[in-house]
Amino acid sequence: MKTIITFIIVFGILVLVHEFGHFYFAKRAGILVREFAIGMGPKIFAHRGKDGTTYTIRLLPIGGYVRMAGMGEDMTEITPGMPLSVELNAVGNVVKINTSKKVQLPHSIPMEVIDFDLEKELFIKGYVNGNEEEETVYKVDHDATIIESDGTEVRIAPLDVQFQSAKLSQRILTNFAGPMNNFILGFILFTLAVFLQGGVTDLNTNQIGQVIPNGPAAEAGLKENDKVLSINNQKIKKYEDFTTIVQKNPEKPLTFVVERNGKEEQLTVTPEKQKVEKQTIGKVGVYPYMKTDLPSKLMGGIQDTLNSTTQIFKALGSLFTGFSLNKLGGPVMMFKLSEEASNAGVSTVVFLMAMLSMNLGIINLLPIPALDGGKIVLNIIEGVRGKPISPEKEGIITLIGFGFVMVLMVLVTWNDIQRFFF
């Protein structure tokens, strides 16, 4: 149960932060966000904000989505011949269109649709009250709403508030905002993980950190913050020098020369033996030195962010030199990592979230249609050509990209199931 909760929290936060980036910059650009959903699947709660956006909570707590007016996935559910009802305002304009059987409007007028335009001309024409001898045309208010089949009430999407009506620079920024939010979140989480761990491990010093009570080092008199100058007359400059000698000498007395408060002391430490992957190594019970000052912690967050980015790009590069599904991971791998992280502690969960956030941001910027990177490429092509690609061609390109992503996800998920459960 702990693993499931961890997975839901991790996945949910990453996706919602990503979608909020699109949401915020769409709003700034004057693009109508028809719905901001938390979760997926059937709606369990909805609230229409004064900003024109409907905020919903859906049954499955896995991520969420943003519906921007005029985007490919935002389709009008009205078709000629459809029975529906309309609600009028005081001047006779339609302010509400009900296509749902789940919702009843007490003052609505039933009609069968003949024709409509909710983008440019803003009208709806049909037979009212079953009278097929007379066609009635109603003007539709610019801010009218439509109640969809599942009962969700959203604003109609006139052309002037659609995605394509915004400036090209605003559309590029709106597409980029999701990955950008993931990068910002990644840095914040990496920095938070450093704070939760107490600081940044410094492996380039001969100064030691925490000494485990009752361990060989503690019993020999070694103390936290001691500087180990030499072991058996071999100079120690960094933590790796220290561990190399200790691991090679299980149950053998070692002469340590340490500096403490400006004075040198000589101690005899006997590493205890420990089995690690069929090898016997020495351990003395000492952790690396940790920098705990604020600048070091902030720099640690930056360094972890840069290291993560480098690792992701190296992994992506390796796909072109030797492609293997084992180099990719989907929801199943994410669940497995969540299980391991939840057992390791809060700081490990935070670090995992940071890694996954950076992954999500970078993967979404790949120039694949249906991903944010693919949309940005289409925006750039529009800027070069001076006009957008036709909606038909863009739809085909997006469909191909979506199909590619879906096939890859199925293969990766199946491969993960085989790896972890069989």
Swiss-Prot record:
It is a multi-pass membrane protein. Pfam families: PDZ_6, Peptidase_M50. PANTHER family: MEMBRANE METALLOPROTEASE ARASP2, CHLOROPLASTIC-RELATED, REGULATOR OF SIGMA-E PROTEASE RSEP. It is found in: Cell membrane. GO terms for cellular component: plasma membrane. Gene3D superfamilies: 2.30.42.10. Belongs to the peptidase M50B family. One of its GO terms (biological process) is proteolysis. Residues 179-273 form the PDZ domain. It is an enzyme of class 3 (hydrolase). This is Probable protease eep. Involved in production of the peptide pheromone cAD1. SMART domains: PDZ (SM00228). Zn(2+) binds at H18, H22. One of its GO terms (molecular function) is metal ion binding. It comes from the Bacteria. InterPro entries: PDZ, PDZ_6, PDZ_sf, Pept_M50_Zn, Peptidase_M50. CDD domains: cpPDZ_EcRseP-like, S2P-M50_PDZ_RseP-like. Signal peptide: none annotated.
